[in-house]
Amino acid sequence: MPELPEVETVRRGLEPALVGARFTTVHLARPDLRFPLPARFAARLTGQRVEALSRRAKYLVADLSSGDALIMHLGMSGRFDVVFPDGRQLSPGEFYLEGAPGQAKHDHVVFALSNGARVTYNDVRRFGFMDLVRRAELETCRHFAGMGIEPLGSDLSGEAVARLFRGRRTPLKAALLDQRLIAGLGNIYVCEALHRARLHPEAAAGTLADAAGRPTRAAARLAQVIRDVLTEAVAAGGSTLRDYAHTDGTQGAFQHRFRVYDREGLACTARGCRGRVRRIVQAGRSTFYCETCQPAP
């Protein structure tokens, strides 16, 4: 499943095609994706101008001139294909490499735009979804209600980490993946951030706050490396794995910078470290960490 950097890569690729243009027609190949599409979905979109395209956690949000917001989630294999009037083609979000995701039979929603562009949503596994909500109700809608802070930007700090994790006995990795605390973090980038912060994934999350609730040095370090890892991943166009390639058909490159993720048994890449990467399973997901850099609690 695409994580925050991959979704941000998609947003940046779609923005030039969508923002400022109106939907002239919306073709639905089926009435549902992962969930049924909203009632009168095509009719509510047709004629509306896209005023902005943003990202919240792993969701894309298009602000429309009608006051609605179009929420889009890529699921496991969703992607967008853009064709411009001059014939140029762009696939911002072509991270899916398994099989032939570009087959027309998997084209589920086609947006024709007033600037002459055509944007097609293609989804092999059909785990993605789209919804329409009033923009004024965006933060309280079922998708975003109770969602945590954004890890990119000023909201994430050592103080925020201490406040969110104080008193929690849950493993640190599980706390970082809890979307009610910090929204948008996924397995890959949590493993990478914990390694850079030299924190064991099974350490209690509450240890990042002292007895008075103040952030420890580890909390400040973790907040910084989370931002660093995500920023580097966005700049690299995300990570291409078995399921996932990148804007205009090229592949994301951050997987070549993995320090621990999917490197079980290999030597740690940290300078001066002679440890090896280990893999454990937490809540059904693989966790990768260095046995030396990230000592057990």
Swiss-Prot record:
Binding sites annotated in the UniProt record for DNA: 106, 125, 168
Enzyme Commission code: 3.2.2.23, 4.2.99.18
Mapped zinc finger ranges (FPG-type): 259-295
PROSITE patterns: FPG_CAT, ZF_FPG_2
Cofactor: Zn(2+)
Pfam families per the UniProt record, alphabetical: Fapy_DNA_glyco, H2TH, zf-FPG_IleRS
Swiss-Prot/TrEMBL keywords: DNA damage, DNA repair, DNA-binding, Glycosidase, Hydrolase, Lyase, Metal-binding, Multifunctional enzyme, Zinc, Zinc-finger
GO biological process, alphabetically ordered: base-excision repair
Active site as annotated: 2-3, 58, 285
Gene3D superfamilies: 1.10.8.50, MutM-like, N-terminal (3.20.190.10)
One GO molecular-function entry: damaged DNA binding
UniProt keyword Hydrolase, yes or no: yes
Cofactor notes: Binds 1 zinc ion per subunit.
Catalytic activity: Hydrolysis of DNA containing ring-opened 7-methylguanine residues, releasing 2,6-diamino-4-hydroxy-5-(N-methyl)formamidopyrimidine; 2'-deoxyribonucleotide-(2'-deoxyribose 5'-phosphate)-2'-deoxyribonucleotide-DNA = a 3'-end 2'-deoxyribonucleotide-(2,3-dehydro-2,3-deoxyribose 5'-phosphate)-DNA + a 5'-end 5'-phospho-2'-deoxyribonucleoside-DNA + H(+)
Function noted in UniProt: Involved in base excision repair of DNA damaged by oxidation or by mutagenic agents. Acts as a DNA glycosylase that recognizes and removes damaged bases. Has a preference for oxidized purines, such as 7,8-dihydro-8-oxoguanine (8-oxoG). Has AP (apurinic/apyrimidinic) lyase activity and introduces nicks in the DNA strand. Cleaves the DNA backbone by beta-delta elimination to generate a single-strand break at the site of the removed base with both 3'- and 5'-phosphates.
NCBIfam families named among the record's database cross-references: fpg (TIGR00577), PRK01103.1 (NF002211)
Quaternary state and interactors: Monomer.
Family recorded in the similarity comment: Belongs to the FPG family.
Name assigned to this protein: Formamidopyrimidine-DNA glycosylase
Organism: Methylobacterium sp. (strain 4-46)
Protein's gene: mutM
